[in-house]
Regions:
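Alpha/propeptide regions of enzymes that mature by internal proteolysis
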Residues: 1-178
Length: 178
């Protein structure tokens, strides 16, 4: 879709029943759905300024507004919605499903590292919670079985290792290192 003439899309995955999830917006929660909200970089900038309040959370307030809209449209309690947000285009979505024995895992990933790739261990760590993040590679992992909190934490580590290896294999350099 569009907002203010700029690209804005939402990927929403509904669950048949509440699922224990881990989300960058909300942490561990019992979710009825998971979403990835994608807005054009200029949309984040302009709406971030429009949503800028006394608390200085422009982009975050814009994302929370969209998350609330989506929850209302789909008759979901916002607290039961695992949420992510990105400026990466959802047209850059990769979907892969693999099975092993009784386990099936589907991964939905969006990436936008052409102009905002930050490399841990190379670039200065300037991101602080509550300030505007510099970019994202969002990865949604869906399974057909319930994972314990410890298993979700282990899966997050494995996904991060895989993402790191993929960026190295693709020779994606930092766009910030001089």
């Amino acid at each position: 879709g569009e907002r203010d003439g700029l690209r804005e899309n939402v990927l929403l995955v509904r669950f048949a029943q509440a699922r224990r999830t881990q989300s960058p917006s909300g942490g561990l929660l019992e979710a009825r759905a998971a979403m990835n909200h994608a807005g054009h970089p200029l949309l984040w900038k302009t709406l971030g300024m429009r949503f800028m309040g006394q608390d200085g959370r422009g982009g975050k307030a814009y994302a929370e507004h969209v998350h609330g809209e989506i929850a209302r449209q789909h008759r979901l309690d916002k607290s039961a919605l695992a949420r992510m947000a990105t400026a990466a285009d959802l047209d850059n979505l990769a979907v892969v499903t693999q099975s092993h024995g009784p386990l099936t895992v589907t991964v939905l990933a969006t990436a936008g590292a052409k102009s905002n790739a930050i490399r841990t261990g190379v670039d200065a760590g300037t991101y602080i919670e509550g300030y505007t993040p510099a970019g994202t590679i969002n990865i949604m992992v869906l399974t057909n079985i319930r994972l314990t909190d410890a298993a979700m934490a282990r899966a997050l580590i494995t996904v991060t290792e895989g993402k790191t290896a993929a960026l190295q294999d693709l020779n994606v350099p930092s766009t910030y290192t001089k």
